[in-house]
Structures are given as C-alpha cells and as structure tokens.
Design a protein with these regions (language model features):
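Glycine-rich, basic loop-to-helix element that forms the pyrophosphate-binding segment
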Residues: 62-78
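Short, acidic, metal-binding catalytic loop of nucleotide-sugar glycosyltransferases
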Residues: 26-35
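Short, flexible, basic/aromatic active-site loop/helix in glycosyltransferases
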Residues: 114-121, 130-154
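N-proximal low-complexity "stem/linker" segments adjacent to membrane-targeting elements
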Residues: 1-27
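Conserved donor NDP-sugar-binding/catalytic core segment of glycosyltransferases
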Residues: 95-127
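Short aromatic/hydrophobic "clamp" motif used to bind/position activated sugar donors
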Residues: 83
Length: 245
C-alpha cells in the first residue's frame, strides 16, 4: 500500500448537532496520527451547527437533507483513498487512523467498522451494546440468508464504517432515497467486492436515543426498522425511526 493509499479522510454527516459538536471537535483534534481530511456534511441544520464547525476551523459542505445524500456528497468531495463515516455522537479511539490503515491493508476486506459501545453520562448500555453487536450477524441471517452465506454482514452508522473511496464510487455509494438504514444496502453492495469485518476496537456512541425512548422501545424500534428494510417497506422506515434532536 502506497503513502497515497494510506491517506484517511473522515466524513461526518450532521443535522442539528450543536450540542454534540464541541466534544467531537476535541476528539478529532486528539487523533494521532491525524487524518488527511475532515469534512462535515450538513443536511440543512436550523441550529448553529454550521457556524460552530466553521468557527472551529473545520470544513463544512452543505447539502440536501438525508444521510445517504450527505454521505454520497461527502465521499465524492474528499480526496483521501480511505474514508470513514463518523457520526457526531460517536467517539473513536485516538489511534483510529492507524487502525483503519492496518485493517484496509488487507485487500480482501472491502468494508469494515469499529465495534460500538453504547454509553451515556451515567451508564453503559450493555444489553443494547450486545444487541447492536449480534444483529450484525442475525439481521442478514434472518432477512437475507442467501447473502449471509455469501458473507454479508450488516454494519450500521454508529459502527464508524470505513472503506476505499474508489470502491464506494464504483458501487454507486448509498441509495440516495434512504433516510435510514442507508448502511444496509451499502453492506450488500460492498460484499460483492470482498469481506466485511467489524474490528475489535470500541467506538463510544451516545445512548441519547435509548435515554429518550427507553431501552425496550429503542431495541424494538431498531428491530422493526430492520424488518421493514428486509421486506422492502422503505417508505415506512423513517416514520418508524423518529428523530430525537
């Protein structure tokens, strides 16, 4: 792998994230080695998100609302060969860039991610963390068994997924019409090119949805939205996945 192939860009799709952004700025500044690029992609925030990003010295690209649209625009706009999609409420380890480089040095891997640890100010959500981990396997096994046999595993937004930019563009990126579960189709597409791997390193992701909905409701929503994706009821997914910001 050449030096150019080792460049890592971070794309952060955001919408009304002014509360989470200051902590994220600190996380990004603390990464060692530093990424070659950091690009925030704002989907029409009505709060101070864009102003905060610019004031902190980071680039922001403004697009239409929709995480799939934002991710596609962000990946197209960066130049780094390795790209990580990071949510504003998810904190990666300090050596994130090196982990990405080491993982993607294996050319057999097309798509990879970290392992999310769901945590709030007062507690770690171990049950939901376990559910989040195991559904990577059971979701494709139940909903797409023929693809599971071929090696498809489903990674999600809070996993901090990463991949090669040229391959993302080659497969057409995320399905633009997907408001949620945009990562699921991406996994199916990437599985045609190689292995999907979840690296055994934590990223700490906020429990704000669980805090707002309660653990039982949150896990039910996660399960239901997955089933809606599986049966092709895409128009209902966003309705059944309410925004908590």
């Amino acid at each position: 792998m050449t030096a150019a192939d080792q460049q890592v860009g971070i794309v952060l799709p955001v919408l009304n994230e002014q509360q989470a952004l200051p902590d994220m700025f600190d996380v990004l500044r603390g990464l060692n080695p530093a990424p070659a690029e950091v690009l925030f992609v704002d989907g029409g925030s009505t709060d101070a998100s864009c102003d905060l990003i610019r004031e902190a010295g980071f680039r922001v690209l403004e697009t239409a609302t929709g995480r799939a649209v934002q991710i596609n625009a962000g990946v197209a706009a960066v130049q780094a060969e390795l790209v990580c999609i990071l949510h504003a409420d998810t904190a990666p380890p300090g050596d994130m860039v090196q982990v990405i480089r080491d993982t993607m040095a294996d050319r057999r891997i097309a798509l990879a991610s970290f392992t999310p640890l769901i945590k709030g100010p007062d507690k770690t959500r171990w049950v939901t963390t376990f559910h989040n981990w195991i559904k990577t396997w059971y979701a494709p096994l139940i909903t797409r068994p023929h693809l599971f046999i071929r090696g498809v595993r489903l990674l999600f937004g809070d996993h901090a997924m990463f991949f090669r930019r040229r391959q993302f563009l080659e497969i057409g990126g995320c399905t633009p019409s997907d408001a949620v579960m945009e990562e699921a189709d991406l996994c199916v597409k990437f599985a045609r090119l190689g292995k999907i791997r979840m690296v055994r390193r934590w990223v700490q992701t906020s429990d704000r949805r669980i805090a707002a909905w309660g653990p039982l409701k949150a896990n039910w929503i996660y399960f239901k939205v997955g089933i809606l994706w599986a049966v092709g009821a895409r128009s209902r997914m966003a309705k059944d996945y309410p925004d908590i910001r």
